[in-house]
Regions:
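Feature marking long nucleic-acid-engaging regions of large polymerase/nuclease enzymes
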Residues: 19, 87, 166-338, 376-390, ...
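Exposed loop/turn and edge beta-strand positions of beta-sandwich/beta-sheet ligand-binding modules
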Residues: 110, 310, 438
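Structured core elements
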Residues: 33, 101, 115, 162-164, ...
Length: 502
């Protein structure tokens, strides 16, 4: 399979080569045959659909006419792994470039031909740019669903007061909690929505959900859900007052010994009877017990209600990972830890080294030797607590329930990276298109890397003339000629002293 990040440097398996001409009109993802450092045959085209980019209507250049006598324009994909395309359009207003979606058609000319699927709007308009980034990150959407087959009924019903804790307005509710008093102890039940049973009863849902990978959120609102809304905010969701299936981790909090014991798993019916926000739960009848239990889980005082729920979900995921490891199936989450040299440098400069020098996590098979999650200090860890919004959790839930489940680890990691790119680009597009004062303060972290606290991230840029630790004033601009927001962001650095003395 042909792989490339820039359509200049290519690899197929262990063979690397350079130059677009050597790719011989193959596109990323195509199955190809390579001889002597070049593609000699395209064995199978990948489905190149939903390609997002800029249709250059405002350019003075045209590249011919279509069979319907429409002008052909240059289309520049956001993704640099694709070359520019020729795309015909009947759009009347050619005074401004537009953002559009195309599908690959064929490649017989200098550039591949694309079929225009949709014009999103004018390039440079914030709403249009945000929608384009969302489609780039998560291009697939659900169409109308057929009636679903219900899973086999289950008899076990949870007793007690079951509650969920989520932000106001949350509808895709993955998790709920039940605390039942025992003699000097507390039975703790962590319930996660049973999505797996619905998938097993309706396997047609699996393929598309896997391709989508996870729910995309904008400002806390699900804008491109992994499952159709009627499922993610309906029959899958642990909505108050509704009987719902749940995969439950149950254990007992021993108050005297300050520890959890007697862990068991079960599939059962629950009904959420109380809803809390993170603010209201801290004032509820459960607050003191949640604080005590979650402080015991963390082995330190935990007073923030957000972290109460976080600790319970971490516990669920740790215990699920142990089951997956024992079964030799499923998907774990590993983390390589710190770049020690970078950590030492950043700490010396007074930067948030724990965050900035941390390696990215990744998915791996439960059978691999190296599964250590350095950040959490766990030999095994997994994602299992959010099956409504994340595909690896669905795979792991199926295995927890005793069913086989196939998983493409590479695809999971690719999808996760796409969502990280979306988060980065949203910071850039909003900064460039909404802020009137385009001046920031930053710190040179190392050569070519600047820490910008107000953005909460490291940005790559030319730092020649500045030593690590230098505090700089940053003016930033948009170079609209570049393909994507990572390239469009242009920084100009000046020493703080120069700015303040002028």
């Amino acid at each position: 399979m042909l792989q490339t990040k820039d359509y200049k440097h290519f690899c197929v398996g262990d063979v690397e080569f350079e130059g677009a001409s050597a790719a011989a009109k193959a596109l990323p993802g195509d199955r190809v045959r390579v001889e002597d450092g070049r593609v000699v045959e395209i064995l199978e085209r990948a489905p190149h659909r939903n390609i997002v980019g800029t249709l250059e209507l405002a350019s003075k250049y045209r590249y011919g006419m279509t069979s319907k006598n429409h002008p052909i324009y240059l289309f520049s994909p956001f993704t640099e792994s694709y070359p520019p395309f020729y795309v015909g359009s009947a759009h009347k207003d050619t005074s401004q470039n537009v953002l559009a979606i195309i599908d690959f058609a064929h490649w017989t000319e200098t550039c591949p031909r694309g079929n225009l699927q949709q014009i999103l709007g004018v390039a440079g308009d914030l709403a249009t740019e945000e929608e384009a980034l969302a489609i780039q990150a998560s291009p697939l959407r659900w169409k109308k669903l057929e009636a679903l087959v219900s899973p086999t009924p289950i008899e076990a019903h949870m007793k007690g007061i079951t509650f969920h804790v989520d932000p106001p307005g949350c509808k895709d509710i993955d998790d709920a909690i039940t605390l039942n008093p025992l003699d000097g102890k507390t039975e703790v039940s962590i319930h996660i929505a049973d999505v797996a049973s619905w998938l097993l009863a309706n396997p047609e849902l699996m393929s598309k959900a896997e391709q989508i990978g996870q729910t995309l959120y904008r400002d806390g609102v699900a804008i491109r859900p992994m499952f159709p809304i009627e499922l993610s905010e309906g029959i899958f969701s642990l909505l108050p007052g509704e009987d719902r299936r749940a995969v439950t981790l149950r254990c007992v909090w021993n108050k005297a010994e300050k520890k959890l014991e007697a862990f068991t798993w079960s599939l059962e019916m629950i009904r959420v009877t109380q809803s809390f926000t993170y603010h209201s739960v801290s004032k509820s009848m459960f607050a003191s017990e949640l604080e005590e239990i979650c402080s015991g889980i963390a082995n330190r005082p935990v007073t923030d209600s957000h972290e109460w729920i976080e600790q319970l979900m971490l516990l669920y995921n740790r215990e699920a990972a142990k089951v997956l490891r024992e079964k030799g199936a499923g998907v774990l989450r590993r983390h390589a830890g710190l770049d020690q040299a970078r950590y030492d440098t950043y700490e010396r400069l007074g930067l948030p080294a724990d965050k900035l020098a941390m390696a990215a996590g990744e998915y791996c098979a439960a059978t691999e030797d190296d599964t250590r999650h350095w950040g959490l200090g766990q030999d095994v860890y997994c994602h299992a607590s959010s099956p409504i919004r994340r595909w690896p959790d669905c795979v792991n839930q199926m295995i927890l329930l005793g069913h086989p489940a196939n998983a493409s680890i590479k695809h999971m990691n690719t999808r996760a990276k796409s969502f990280k790119v979306y988060e980065r680009d949203m910071v850039f597009v909003r900064a460039l298109l909404t802020n009137h004062d385009k001046t920031l303060k930053g710190t040179i972290a190392e050569s070519g890397r600047i820490w910008i606290p107000s953005w909460g991230r490291i940005v790559k840029s030319d730092t020649i003339g500045f030593e690590p630790g230098s505090v700089v004033a940053i003016q930033y601009f948009c170079d609209a000629t570049k393909r994507n927001w990572k390239r469009r962001l242009v920084l100009k650095l000046e020493p703080i002293e120069t700015i303040t003395s002028s």
